[in-house]
Amino acid sequence: MVEIENKYKIINDKKFGYVNWIGFWTLYKKEVLRFLIVVIQTIISPLVTSLLFLFVLSLAIGNERGEVLGFPFITFLAPGLIAMQVIQQAFSHSSSSIMIGKIQGNIVDILYAPLTAAEITLATNLAACTRSIIIALVSIIVFSFIVELKFHNFLYIIVFTFLGSFILSSIGIIVGLWA
């Protein structure tokens, strides 16, 4: 019996520890590269959508709308449009990643990898958060040329952008698995 066990013993038994950091990083990088390959569709398109909303709403409402909490309406509108794109793209990235994997049949490649469910979920969530934060940064840069944006606390902006995108990307994973 010992001879059989030695004959079929795996020679290079790889031990990952509690977390498979290499697999986690690889999946995260795969998800980030998935949206960076089509940057016009994933980064520029949400920016153009936000700009169109900004222009259409500012033209439709115009100067008829007074100030909101002491700020001009367009200054009040711009952060809301940025937040809208952050949560929308976080949800879209994670749910479409799962759905595309299910439809194309390549989700089995991820499921066969030595990754736990938490590692797969966290890598997908963080990739969606990365996409959302990139969209937020690009939108802030472009909107700052059009609208006077006022920042009161950068730490709050970073924390709430990350948490909002993380929550919506988690919901996107649930919807992607359920659909």
Describe these PLM feature segments:
Residues 89-115, 125-128:
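Transmembrane helix boundary and interhelical loop/hinge segments in multi-pass membrane proteins
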Residues 117, 122-179:
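Alpha-helical transmembrane segments and their short interhelical loops
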